[in-house]
Amino acid sequence: MAIMSDKWIKEAVINQSMIKPFVEKQVRVHNKDKIISYGLSSYGYDARVSNEFKIFTNINSTTVDPKNFSEYNLVDREVDVCIIPPNSFALGRTIEYFKVPRDILVICVGKSTYARCGIIVNVTPLEPEWEGHVTLEFSNTTPLPAKIYANEGACQFLFLNSDQMCDTSYADRQGKYMKQVGVTLPLT
């Protein structure tokens, strides 16, 4: 597998609408304010998190069960700054909508700005022909409240090209998270 360059990413956006909206260069300042960067980088794309968050809470004394997930585990917030409680977790989503080509696997890594503050972002790989908004999982590993800034960079996506086309893509097997919009909760 080879990692794809900024040149390839631009071409895939133009020819296959791979990322919408697409920002062709790194943005580090907005209205004269420093922000957490987003946009195209040398070998990846730094995506933004929207202002839509679901924050884990224990006010309803429920159990987190991935096979029978309860929305009572979460508090919905539409905010410019999401505050994640200590040692807790929040879900967000990318502003960008992705359409992954059939010969590409996309891996997500966190931003060092957040990682150095004890905030970890996790996303499972975006499989060939998957499309949708990416649900982002943010973990606050610190004993203090932590901030996530909406409309700023949250993670970086790396595009890996296979030397061979897959037999069955995510679309072929009708994956349960296909064409998701908004923050998508666990499905079984």
From Swiss-Prot:
Q: Which organism is it from?
A: Rickettsia canadensis (strain McKiel)
Output this protein's name. dCTP deaminase
Question: What Enzyme Commission number(s) appear in the record?
Answer: 3.5.4.13
Positions of disulphide bridges = none
Please list the residues that bind dCTP.
Answer: 111-116, 135-137, 156, 170, 179-180
Single Gene Ontology BP annotation: dUMP biosynthetic process
Catalysed reaction per UniProt? Answer: dCTP + H2O + H(+) = dUTP + NH4(+)
**Biological function:** Catalyzes the deamination of dCTP to dUTP.
Q: Fill in the subunit field for this protein.
A: Homotrimer.
Its pathway, per UniProt, is: Pyrimidine metabolism; dUMP biosynthesis; dUMP from dCTP (dUTP route): step 1/2
Tell me which positions the record assigns to the signal sequence: none
